[in-house]
Amino acid sequence: MWIQVRTMDGRDTRRIDSLSKLTKVEDLRARIQQIFGVALESQRLFYRGKQMENGHTLFDYSVGLNDIVQLLVRQIPDSVPTKDKECGISDADSGCGSGQGESDKNSSCGEGATDVDGQPAGINSENVGPSLYKKNDLVDARDLNMGAWFEAQIVSVSKRVNPDGMSAEILDTSAASDDIIYHVKYEDYPENGVVQLTYKDVRLRARTTLPWHDLKVGQVVMVNYNPDEPKERGYWYDAEILRKRETRTIKEIYVKVLLGDAGDSLNDCRIRFVDEIYKIEEPGSAYITTESPQKRQNGPECKHCKDNPKRACRMCACYVCGGKQDPEKQLLCDECDMAFHIYCLKPPLSAIPQDEDWYCPDCRNDASEVVLAGEKLKESKKKAKMASASSSSQRDWGKGMACVGRSRECTIVPSNHYGPIPGVPVGTLWKFRVQVSESGVHRPHVAGIHGRSNDGSYSLVLAGGYEDDVDNGSEFTYTGSGGRDLSGNKRTAEQSCDQKLTNMNRALALNCSAPINDKEGAVAKDWRAGKPVRVVRNTKGKKHSKYAPEDGNRYDGIYKVVKYWPEKGKSGFLVWRYLLRRDDEEPAPWSKEGKERIKKLGLVMQYPDGYLESLASKEREKENKTEDELSESPSKGKRKRNSAGSGLSDAKSTPKKTKVESYKLSLDQKTLIKQDDLNAKLWREVMSFLKEGPKFLSKVEETFLCICCQEVVYEPITTECHHNICKGCLDRSFKALVHNCPACRHDLGKNYSLNVNKPLQAILSQLFPGYERGR
């Protein structure tokens, strides 16, 4: 097998050949050193987000054929300092740890450091001098994140100290100064603690409601507004009145909501609570005593229960029971922010844990399953059960193409699809069985029959077979599976017991248009009424059949089971035999018509990505090795020299590009394409690929791929921005309150109607018959 190694910046990509699934990571590093020239200790290898460590194999990391492994070159410092600089970056800072170290928590070099008494650094609480507000004054304080004003109380007042250590003097005692710091505490949010604000974000608490006739256009007032849900009660913002309108029944007022000093605003917002508009108090007005104020009404914190204390709510209270009692016994998950009573957990906790972070059972990650950077992989239970894990054989089984695994999967039709695969004509050739699996024609890598014992058989492969199998091309006898000891990791063995009509043998028998009979077999009265079976012939069948391909695997079309019966084979054991007969409209690939059609369609051998390059690289290595051996050995005679023009002639003699037969659309299909007006531009581009033959279907699949599920759209919704998405995918997006096009983020709106594009659905069903099954 071979893989691609790419540098982390993406500038250099090299292919590494002659690898195995059992290749050690340290051996891979040695190969990378030869090709990239990077020292072993400077290499960091990553595959699918995991850092590859020595001692493991490519199989342990599930590295597949032609997969990409990323190479990060580690920078090794010339000299390691003996002592870290003060406030320097430690080794833990460059690692992948998730927690904060004790040294970081106690460091005084970071931002927001505090003194011993808890007072922020650079703040002097002595000799503050005159200020606008005093301790215990009731004020409105602005939240710097959202720009809304909340009721608060001043806890203390302090003075900022200049960097030179001298206190800033207040020149005008009546004017506000940036050097005065107000320590305030929000009344409704004590959990936020004490917040430091300047005079711009603190003012006297609003207490005067303005009547309707006193509201003037251009006046700045305090209003209640909810930016997310304008029809609901929200928080208190400064706003400039834009216009007002009064009729006999309603009063309307539109404002520009001001969101802080940065200049951000929300224009043309309608205020619903016109009777609760407050005047902004000027500095120097009469102070409010602690006994007097009437609290303003804010929007509910919880949209589900509207802050009703008698109503159980799993959103704002305990996520298990919904109860709002015992708030001191509730734990808040640091991941999902849901609350849990300690006695509602399973198992319950006796006390609040002392850990800094706590995660609920749904969010908690098992520390034993987490693989940190630099750690070895955990043992896989699945791989531990494999025969290769307990085998004592030293044979390198990881070089075969049957072990590389699929690099892609056929999703155009489900795995239990009967009949042809759309876009795969009769006569298609593949070099390896794994490619046949990727195309969807025959999904198992090794097994000869693909099916289900309660449904039927979908495909089979004619490979080595049995000695007494008869292949007449359009009709052949096939011997069932089983009766062999394939324990361990064996692929084949001699017949050692009788076969039974179970598992895949029964699946193939179900394709016969006759009642199942596991004693004597059955014969179909109308063999064409049976279920279709896709048949692939392998080159290994050449020892028994002249119809097998010269190389690789070939798709030979649809066959039907005529009859099946038990009999004793040459081995002396009972085997089940099946007679299959061809029933396909496309000509057989060995016939004259079939050969002409293969030529017209331009069907040639298909190789895995990178296979030909790997093969050419091996040939060059052999040639170089041979030349080195010849140059080192003493010459006894003249060696024939290659002509100077031979290499050029080989390069010029490229095969002629054969003309491919165009893909033909039926009259009904052309009519449906014309009816699909919404996708007229896409169809014009797709129709230009008709002359490419089978590639036309690949272009259709690529063009009408749903961006959500990455499959051909089913029940397509063609949006107003001309993107095609499955109705189910778009419906799930709308249920998640995301009303944008998944492709371009165009706003579709909450009331967007999901109308299926019926002409597009009809043409896709004709081009890809059966693709809607399982969707």
Curated annotation (Swiss-Prot):
A zinc finger (RING-type) spans 706-745. Pathway: Protein modification; protein ubiquitination. The keyword Signal does not apply. The record marks 316 as: Histone H3K4me0 binding. It holds the Pfam family SAD_SRA. It is found in: Nucleus. GO terms for cellular component: chromatin; euchromatin; heterochromatin; nucleus; replication fork. A zinc finger (PHD-type) spans 299-366. This is E3 ubiquitin-protein ligase UHRF1.
